[in-house]
Amino acid sequence: MLCLGLVVMRCQPLRRALNCSQGWWIIKIDIYDVFIGKSAFGNPCGVLELNGWLSDSELHQITREVGQPVTSFITHVDGRFHIRWFALDGEINLCGHGSLGAGAAILSKYQLENVVFNSKYGEVVISKRDDQYSLVLPSWEAKPCAVPVEISDLATDAIDVFSTRDLVLVLPSVEAVMNFQPDDDRLREINEYHALIVTAANGNSGYVLRYFAPKIGISEDLATGSAQCSLAPYWFKKLGSDALNARQLSMSGGYFEVERTTENSITVFAQAKRRAIAI
């Protein structure tokens, strides 16, 4: 059986993860660092192109073997690209950095100017602009909400609270975001939200954020594209601008430029780089 595009030393472990029965389904594996630049090292993702879909359990096994925070799986069927995203704890419903890394891989391989990925949750469009990639994402309405009692003491400094897919705490300063101390055990108890985001204005031209999703195995995400679906529309309104920059204050850091595309969508511009050696 062939494991095309794999470094030899990684081929056998991945075959074992598939019980030696499906190795030929894997066409190519890459690792991309996404949302890099401006002293930010971004968020790594695995990108796997498959000849066809494997079972959910096999995709999850491969994700664990690849060992990145998220792995994007792509198929190319009847001229259409399809995508699914898996974190270490299982499948997730939308991943910005996984989408952009997958887009960078496909645009390079097929020499395309843009690519449309079809997913269970709608289309994701990736394009290349100079040294940046663009990712069109939905704009999520900010709905006022109460702080769940499980984390009420974590929100004592919040100056605003709202919800989308995620729970968002708006803090008074960049320093407050940097110094925020989460509690993974209590965050796992908030069943109605995907993750907790803390954010603050960063002058008049942008904002900062941190993103916590222990329910899906991500204690603190390094750089989160989908968080901009929640934050960009809020800060467009608050800061009176349709184009902002965002910085994620994680251990490695993430850098984004965001623009309002329509009333229902935003565009995220960012850099992504393929690692010199694929796994």
Swiss-Prot record:
Keywords associated with the record: Isomerase
Biological process terms in GO annotation: biosynthetic process
GO-annotated molecular function: isomerase activity
SUPFAM superfamilies: Diaminopimelate epimerase-like
Similarity field: Belongs to the PhzF family.
Cited InterPro entries: Phenazine_PhzF-like (IPR003719)
EC number: 5.1.-.-
Gene Ontology CC entries for this record: cytoplasm
Protein name from the UniProt record: Uncharacterized isomerase VC_A0395
Xref: Gene3D superfamilies: Diaminopimelate Epimerase, Chain A, domain 1
